[in-house]
Amino acid sequence: EELNPEPGSHIAVVVKNTKSNFWATVKKGMTAAVKDLNEKMGYKGDDKVKLSFEGPADELDVESQINTIDAVLAENPTVLCLSAIDMESCGAQLEEAMGNEIPVVILDSGVESELVNTVCATDNYAAGAEAAKKMAEAIGNKGQVAIMAHAETSKSSQDREKGFTEEIAKNYPE
């Protein structure tokens, strides 16, 4: 499907952590895509599609992320792309976006909510299961492993952990 944004559209992106290599790569890709889009559409000056990319420096700083989402919504963006640290904590912001007819695209974390228009994410459960297979192979299909999750409230982290532990329990019980 063709993407034909209106001149002057604002794509607001709020991520979990602006300091991580993953999100730096996402920002680089999104910046290049918006540049290409502006060239393709012939947008110049104020007609260019604008991309803002914000978030806390620390992936555990839920309050800072909520404040960032509030500030972004005050700018009335055309669309909000969000990778929430804790989806339950930003319900009011999602309701505000819906009330202002700002579509919400969730990045990197699955979420089940009528307040979200679409989700763009890895199948984190499958990624966790694949990590378990590789780990089991590396240790001869038996032994003990420890799980060190990076973010307890992150749906992506929870799904990866669940995929990993269920794969280990099912296929590598020793």
Model segments located where?
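A residue-level marker of the well-folded mature domains of exported/periplasmic proteins
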Residues: 1-174
